[in-house]
Amino acid sequence: MASTNDLKNGLVLKLDGGQLWSVVEFQHVKPGKGPAFVRTKLKNVLSGKVVDKTFNAGVKVDTATIDRRDMQFSYMDGEYFVFMDMDTYDQLMVDRKAVGDAANFLIEGFTASVAQHEGEVLYVELPAAVELTIQHTDPGVQGDRSTGGTKPATLETGYEIGVPLFITTGEKIKVDTRSGDYLGRVNS
């Protein structure tokens, strides 16, 4: 339990029948007339839905402890992603729903942050940018500007992104894991 006066960004609250909500923004408001209150913007940890919620100042709210651990992606086992804890060497099977869009950028050996609450995996978080190899892309043709200077390329994970015309098959590039956009070449 914590008071609404103790709210901070990133704190996870248990509200609405046990649902987990992360504090995105908060503001303590002290109007000239009436009691003080706290205006918050909360994001549902599982669905990503964002809502505005107002609490009276000093009210007690349930907090949840989220255990984030760095784990290494080992391999796929059917529909499950198998991660290994680098400290204990324990393996953890994570379903595709919890991995989400991170599946587009995971290759064996990558380290990801796995968030758990009471033993249940909530989500998998990758670093903001990862380095991946272009598995296939067509050669860029001089003067071909119908696509705005980009062409499709397939990464080693099978995910397809748009890259500049000068990128060739086999090159290593940086990719933004949040948007899936090309960030640049990796200097060898």
From Swiss-Prot:
Database matches in Gene3D superfamilies: 2.30.30.30, Nucleic acid-binding proteins (2.40.50.140)
Enumerate the Pfam families for this protein. Answer: EFP (PF01132), EFP_N (PF08207), Elong-fact-P_C (PF09285)
Q: Where in the cell is it found?
A: Cytoplasm
Main site of residence?
Answer: cytoplasm
InterPro entries in UniProt: Elong-fact-P_C (IPR015365), NA-bd_OB-fold (IPR012340), Rib_uL2_dom2 (IPR014722), Transl_elong_fac_P/YeiP (IPR020599), Transl_elong_KOW-like (IPR013185), Transl_elong_P/YeiP_cen (IPR001059), Transl_elong_P/YeiP_CS (IPR013852), Transl_elongation_fac_P (IPR011768)
State the Gene Ontology terms under molecular function: translation elongation factor activity
User: In terms of domain of life, where is this protein from?
Assistant: Bacteria
Task: Extract the SMART domains matched here.
Answer: EFP (SM01185), Elong-fact-P_C (SM00841)
Q: Entry's PROSITE patterns?
A: EFP (PS01275)
Spell out the GO cellular component terms annotated for this protein, sorted alphabetically and separated by semicolons.
Answer: cytoplasm
What pathway does the UniProt record associate with this protein? Answer: Protein biosynthesis; polypeptide chain elongation
GO BP: peptide biosynthetic process
**Family annotation (NCBIfam families):** efp, PRK00529.1
As for family, the record states: Belongs to the elongation factor P family.
Role of this protein: Involved in peptide bond synthesis. Stimulates efficient translation and peptide-bond synthesis on native or reconstituted 70S ribosomes in vitro. Probably functions indirectly by altering the affinity of the ribosome for aminoacyl-tRNA, thus increasing their reactivity as acceptors for peptidyl transferase.
Report what the protein is called. Answer: Elongation factor P
Q: What species is given as this protein's source?
A: Streptomyces griseus subsp. griseus (strain JCM 4626 / CBS 651.72 / NBRC 13350 / KCC S-0626 / ISP 5235)
Tell me the organism's taxonomic lineage: Bacteria, Bacillati, Actinomycetota, Actinomycetes, Kitasatosporales
